[in-house]
Amino acid sequence: MTFAELRVDVVILCCAVSAGIHAALVPAHFEEGTGPGVGFILASVAPAACAVLLTRRPSRLALAGTAAVFAGLIIGYLIVLASGLPVLHPEREPVEALAVCTKVIEAIGLAVAAGCLRRPAATHVDRLVTT
């Protein structure tokens, strides 16, 4: 296993953990309402899809998309903390340890994915893709 493959695997692991935590919280958020429940379904499906894509066909585009998903999840959480998110989660959310841990994992995934994109010669992500 190369260092480039290891870095992609770290991103995949971060995707899987994020997806799993969000999926586990779907029922509790449906109890709050349809919007929060649907929001958590989306927050589960997006990183899960990224994990599958990076596992099957790692590429710069897949890494960029994954970085965007992680950034969106982190920014979305910050918005929910500050003011709520219209339609999906209109109520402000209190800071919780599990949420903070999840955001730390997503931030790690974002940083590693961005690092792979910044140093393409060092990561050799394009060579991981076979045609």
Task: Please give the residue ranges for each predicted region.
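Membrane-interface extramembranous regions
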Residues: 1-131
